[in-house]
Amino acid sequence: AESSHGFVQEITCCSPLGIAVVDNKIIVSQPPDLIVYTDVNRNARFDQGIDQREVLLTGFSGANHDHSLHSVTVGPNGQYYFNHGNKGSQVTDKEGWELNAGSFYGMKQVSGKPSSDGQVYNGGVALRVNPDGTGMRPIGHNFRNSYEQAASSLGDVFQNDNDDPQACRTTW
């Protein structure tokens, strides 16, 4: 890029670990929230009263911590794919489906607590959700700190778990 500029500035956005631009939507991973800004007038600036700000999901632990909520990518099915590290989460989607994911590193109060599907999720979790905040479902868990994922045209999702342990490997 030959130039850059700020789109939005908020006191609560102090160290987002992911920014995705999907058409006129800017998706910011700022724990505890996954925020969607919609640039309604498409002028590449957030205009209060014209543009929209929505907290799509909330409940991700680890504000200002690298083992928290990471960036969104879009799969071939149009769903948002994202993950969070092992700081944990207790997140409810727009339909009321609840994810509980704890670990020794964070959110110990939900460790061992089943999510809405009856499953117990540990550590970092990879997820998908519809753009309207419904249909959130885990697609993998027990990661340390996976930063981002890529979805193939066939829907396979690849990610690389981050950090020191030998167990941190590329998964799909």
Mark where each language-model region is:
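Beta-propeller domains with acidic blade repeats across secreted/periplasmic ectodomains
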Residues: A1-W172
